[in-house]
Regions:
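Radical SAM/AdoMet-radical enzyme domain recognition
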Residues: 1-102
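Generic structural "secondary-structure junction" signal
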Residues: 12, 105-108, 251, 256
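Low-complexity, compositionally biased segments
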Residues: 37, 51, 149-151, 245-254
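Radical SAM enzyme [4Fe-4S]-AdoMet core and its adjacent flexible, acidic
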Residues: 44, 62-238
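C-terminal target-recognition/interaction regions appended to catalytic cores
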Residues: 215-268
Length: 268
């Protein structure tokens, strides 16, 4: 279960946050977190919610309530903040990942200039590489089921004597071994298990908390990782998710089932 929220009540009502935390582990927060700048927030949300977001994170940290920060990206507005947002997220106890969503041209968008304001998945990926020292091109993997719309990376927050080290999962197993069904060169006798656990981790249907079992099993397959003191709280995920709109609509990607209309189809 995931709560999609602007964080206002979470920021104001710590008892409410405690109640939400009681629903874990099969529960997480999907928190709007677009920018640190007033002008951007005024444009995207109609209000400067900087202090609200920071207070919400503070309350979520108190209960270590699993949280994904959701960043709506618009070219010329906040694409230069990607690295800063990732750096902030990695320092928060409760944050399990960041989802970057290029603006979908639908609904309340007015006077949107597609030529100058629309940002693509590829551009977001490039911005992550330019602005974050943690991730390389090999770490950000297009998801095979829909590589034009989804890209994902996992990292481990590894405890050290001086604090914490962020290590992308692809330091332990290569993207080719995940995506191309090649045999693992790391642990030959466990390659099928590694492949299975990694594919499940790289599924958008798996929340970070629900990935705990897959994560634990995967750690057992990787001898270079001391996994006995690690849990899903050490897992950090980046997703770039591009929702279709009338400018990049792919009619082969929506369901013909009249009883199930995906949000991209409905909004477009």
């Amino acid at each position: 279960l995931m709560l999609n929220t602007n964080g206002i009540r979470i920021a104001k009502d710590v008892d409410f946050v405690e109640k939400l935390a009681s629903y874990m582990p099969d529960f997480e927060i999907y928190l709007q977190f677009d920018s640190f700048r007033k002008d951007v927030l005024m444009d995207l949300r109609g209000e400067d919610v900087t202090d609200v977001r920071k207070k919400a994170i503070e309350n979520l940290n108190k209960f270590n309530l699993s949280t994904t920060l959701v960043v709506v990206l618009q070219k010329g507005k906040n694409e230069d903040e990607i690295g800063e947002i990732l750096d902030f997220a990695l320092k928060q106890k409760c944050v399990r990942g960041v989802t970057f969503q290029p603006t979908q041209v639908a609904g309340r968008n007015e006077d949107f200039d597609v030529a100058t304001q629309k940002i693509t998945l590829t551009e977001v990926r490039r911005k992550i590489l330019e602005q974050s020292p943690v991730f390389t091109a090999e770490d950000l993997i297009p998801v095979p089921c829909n590589p034009d719309a989804l890209c994902m990376a996992y990292a481990l927050k590894m405890p050290t004597e001086n604090g914490e080290e962020i290590v992308p999962m692809t330091r332990y197993i290569s993207p080719e071994e995940i995506l191309n069904n090649a045999r693992s060169t790391i642990v030959y006798e466990h390659d099928e298990q590694i492949k299975e656990h990694m594919l499940k981790l790289f599924s958008t249907g798996t929340s970070v908390d629900c990935a705990e079992d897959e994560f634990g099993d995967l750690m057992c397959c990787l001898p270079r990782v001391k996994g006995e003191n690690l849990s899903y709280t050490n897992l950090f995920r980046i997703i770039i998710m591009n929702f279709m709109d009338c400018y990049d609509f792919d009619d082969g990607s929506f369901s013909p089932d009249v009883y199930r209309i995906i949000c991209c189809t409905y909004k477009s």
